[in-house]
Every structure is written in C-alpha cells, then in structure tokens.
Amino acid sequence: GAFAFESLKKFTPKSIFDMSIVTACIRPSGASYRDALLARTPHSNPSEIIDELLKDNLGYLIYQEDTIKFLQQICGLSGSEADNIRRAIGRKQKDRLDAAMPSILEGYCEKSPQPRAVAESEAKEFLQIIEDSASYQFGYNHSIAYCLLGYLCAYYRYYHPLEFITSFLNNAANEDDIRNGTAYAHKI
C-alpha cells in the first residue's frame, strides 16, 4: 500500500531527499552498500574528488546521475560514453555493461594517483556497484517522484484509512492484494 518504505524505519529520514536515497538504495543496484547506508555509515572513498562528487549521498553511487558523473569525472569517459552506459543500465542490458567494464577500469586506473594494483582494487568496488546497477538503478527524478507518491500513500493510509483502503481495493492487481487489503480493513 505504501510501497517499499519499511527500510525508512531503519534510516529515519529527515527530508524527501533522505527518503529518495533509501528508496533508491533498496533497488537491486544498492545490494553492495544497502546495510551500511541504512545505518548512515558514510562511505570512505579513496579520494577527496570522489567524496566531493558523492557528498550528498553519504559517499555512495546511488542514482544514474551519480554513475554518469563518476564515469566522466573519475574514469575519464566522454559524456556520450557515460550516457550509453546509463542507457544500458536503464534497459537492463547487462551484456553492453559488461563490454564497457574494461574501459571503465582502465580509465579509473589511468586517472588515479595510486599505484596500478591499488587503483584496480579501488575500481573493483565501484565496478561492483555499477554492475549491480544493471539490475536496476533509479534516476534521481524518478526516485523523488516515487517517494512523493509513497509518502502520499502513507499519509492517506494513516490519516484517511477508509479512503486509502477503498482506493487500494479498487485498484488491487490480484487476489493477494484483495486479501491483504481486506485483512488490513478488518484490522483498522
């Protein structure tokens, strides 16, 4: 009824932007950092440039836009190359993403001031997040809209339960939704 907002209890958001971060991280793309982010543990990135790039997201690559900025500014890809990777992520084209991984790794290592072995180790962490993104990564605007809709559902569920459950049952997609909605209606 109110989307996947159970994780919000762990994060205790203070704004719609915090809600957006949680909503985006519970997608499959957040698998490798979800628990740390929900615990509000800032990610320790290997450079101040990456920290600055991801400062609004506790240091994590959360949105498609973060991935594009990372690919351009940290890995040296052009805007069109980064956008092609974003499209591959958006269309869940894992094969295209896999084909781009060597150039992302090489770009990261070339721009890193670290020795090659250290840079490769650092890059692999980000590559895992980008690979996870192929399962599904939200764009920032989509995440904000999703949160606002979820927030409104939660608001109506709490303050206007009759209207909420009526709307929920009228729009139920299957028998499980009807059964769950009816059980909730009896409970309230």
PLM-predicted stretches and their roles:
Residues A2-I188:
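Noncatalytic, beta-rich nucleic-acid-contacting surfaces in large DNA/RNA-processing enzymes
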